[in-house]
């Protein structure tokens, strides 16, 4: 059952137009399957203990709910909160005894203060127009001595085309141009994720630490890797919407690299080498 007590009657759009009706489900599921080894290791390194009460703030399609619950079972609990109804429908697949989900805006979720021992929040805080306000709200939900972990992918630009840094740079610039136009953002908005450490310090939290790992994939790829790169990146993040931001020749070359039916399809190249950073900042209340 999905608890909708916190659902906004008139959802306010987030920085990237997020509302209760926004659906990134396929992209989130693809990312979580792709990055599962690294995400699981990041969670295991947090030294959670059985019996802890955990909040997954911005739980998306819910894959991490089960991973977190494994760390606090048998008598711990995990609550997942997300604004999107579609995401929480997908998260149903990960429900089990001790795991619940709630549809709500993070800033207005009907959760008691000082009710959690640990908060996990990945690729979420910078969807808010006021990230610092979001961190302060989450911190208020922690018990004394509780910890919050903010995870963020891609603090550094991802590497897709190791053999062609020029096309990679132009593609990344085209993506930024699209987001600037589509969501009326400026360059500071688009690079704000790099300020994760500063945000935690500005929130006046204690014992702030930060660690970055590299998600690295080379040919031959696992099916989950290929699905994420082709569907979530090549098709959904890039695709036809980048046409207007690239020259005809560059767009044609990019299209060939992203097309499974083309002889130049990037994911079949023996020299395919992908790098993405994943950063986790941890702080104590």
Regions found by a protein language model. Give the residues of each.
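A short acidic, Gly/Pro-enriched loop at the edge of an enzyme's catalytic core
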Residues: 108-118
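C-terminal helical/coil "lid" or tail adjacent to the Rossmann-like core of SAM-dependent
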Residues: 3-4, 10, 14-24, 170-171, ...
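Core SAM-dependent methyltransferase catalytic element
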Residues: 203-206, 276-285
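A short SAM/SAH-binding and catalytic strip from SAM-dependent methyltransferases
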Residues: 117-132
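Class I SAM-dependent methyltransferase SAM/SAH-binding core
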Residues: 55-57, 61-109
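Conserved class I S-adenosyl-L-methionine
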Residues: 1-50, 63-67, 87-90
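Conserved catalytic/acceptor-binding region of the Class I
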Residues: 150-221
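A short glycine-rich, Lys/Arg-flanked "PGG" loop and its adjoining helix->strand segment in the class I
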Residues: 132-147
């Amino acid at each position: 059952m999905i608890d909708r007590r916190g659902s906004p009657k008139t959802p306010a759009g987030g920085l990237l137009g997020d509302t209760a009706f926004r659906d990134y489900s396929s992209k989130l599921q693809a990312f979580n399957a792709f990055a599962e080894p690294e995400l699981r290791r990041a969670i295991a390194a947090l030294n959670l203990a059985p019996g802890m009460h955990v909040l997954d703030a911005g739980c998306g399609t819910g894959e991490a709910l089960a991973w977190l619950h494994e760390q606090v079972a048998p008598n711990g609990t995990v609550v997942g909160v997300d604004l999107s109804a579609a995401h929480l429908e997908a998260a149903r697949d990960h429900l089990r005894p001790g795991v619940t989900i709630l549809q709500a805006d993070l800033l207005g979720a009907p959760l008691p203060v000082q009710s959690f021992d640990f908060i996990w929040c990945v690729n979420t805080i910078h969807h808010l127009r006021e990230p610092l306000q979001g961190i302060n709200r989450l911190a208020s939900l922690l018990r004394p001595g509780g910890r919050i972990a903010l995870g963020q992918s891609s603090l550094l630009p991802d590497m897709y085309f190791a053999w062609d840094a020029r096309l990679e740079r132009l593609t990344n610039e085209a993506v930024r141009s699209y987001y600037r136009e589509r969501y009326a953002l400026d360059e500071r908005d688009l690079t704000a994720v790099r300020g994760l450490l500063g945000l935690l310090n500005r929130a006046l939290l204690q014992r702030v630490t930060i660690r970055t790992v590299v998600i690295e994939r080379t040919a031959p790829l696992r099916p989950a890797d290929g699905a994420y790169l082709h569907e979530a990146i090549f098709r959904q993040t890039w695709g036809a919407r980048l046409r207007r931001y690239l020259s005809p020749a560059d767009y044609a070359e990019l299209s060939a690299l992203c097309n499974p039916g083309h002889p130049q399809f990037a994911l079949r190249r023996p020299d395919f080498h992908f790098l993405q950073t994943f950063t986790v900042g941890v702080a104590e209340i």
